[in-house]
């Protein structure tokens, strides 16, 4: 400078490297992979991954825990778009995978073991990241074998005059299976409702604003005891 005072020059250099290019291995399951697998809930997808042990306490929608490489279930960090969503209302911060259905999920990233270390100490056994990014193909889908087992999901995206990218995803899944009690007459079912809103706006070539809203509600039937079908 003109006065000869020492100063520090700060310059920016874009970092184009990604985690997997820095020696971190992750398994990516795309929307196309999910559709090809015929999966209904996230458990159907994760069962395809070696090294993940899935324990479900009943039919679809019941409490489900995942154990990775012999570690406790709460040692696996669960994220939504990079934000931790483990249930902190429980003692160990467990995540119930039985509540997760895949109709509004765009991609699943799985980091096993030390590959999840960059997420912090909560990811001792690894991390699972659910991505609900914008899908620019407007679709809707209805499927059902009968009135007791059916699903509906839709995706709609619009780019307005102010260059806002607005996206809505919604889904409803209903499944009624056989009774958990042998020779029982009551169907124990599950109903899942999901809404996902995404908004993106590019401020300039290197900066963008991104916001997401995700809501889910799962109700599952269960039997009170081995002789009582009401739960």
For each predicted feature, which ranges?
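Solvent-exposed loop/turn segments connecting transmembrane beta-strands
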Residues: 58, 120-122, 142-153
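Short acidic/polar hinge/loop motifs at secondary-structure boundaries
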Residues: 65, 84-112
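A beta-strand signature from Gram-negative outer-membrane beta-barrel systems
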Residues: 99-139
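Periplasmic-side early beta-strands and strand-to-turn transitions of outer-membrane beta-barrels
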Residues: 129, 136-138, 151, 155-231
């Amino acid at each position: 400078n003109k006065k000869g005072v020492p100063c520090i020059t700060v310059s920016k250099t874009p970092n184009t490297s990604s985690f997997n290019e820095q020696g971190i291995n992750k398994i990516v399951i795309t929307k196309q992979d999910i559709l090809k697998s015929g999966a209904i809930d996230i458990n159907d997808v994760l069962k395809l991954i070696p090294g993940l042990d899935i324990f479900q306490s009943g039919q679809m929608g019941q409490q489900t825990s995942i154990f990775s490489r012999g570690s406790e279930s709460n040692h696996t960090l669960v994220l939504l778009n990079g934000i931790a969503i483990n249930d902190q209302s429980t003692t160990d911060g467990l995540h119930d995978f039985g509540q997760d259905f895949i109709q509004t999920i765009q991609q699943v990233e799985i980091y096993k073991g030390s590959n999840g270390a960059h997420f912090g100490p909560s990811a001792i056994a690894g991390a699972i990241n659910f991505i609900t990014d914008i899908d620019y193909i407007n679709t809707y889908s209805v499927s059902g074998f009968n009135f007791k087992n059916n699903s509906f999901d839709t995706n709609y995206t619009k780019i307005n005059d102010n260059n806002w990218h607005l996206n809505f995803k919604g889904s409803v899944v209903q499944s009624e299976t056989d009774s958990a009690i042998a020779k029982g007459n009551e169907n124990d079912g599950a109903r899942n409702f999901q809404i996902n809103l995404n908004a993106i706006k590019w401020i300039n070539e290197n900066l963008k604003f991104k916001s997401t809203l995700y809501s889910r509600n799962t109700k599952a039937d269960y039997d009170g005891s081995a002789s009582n079908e009401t739960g």
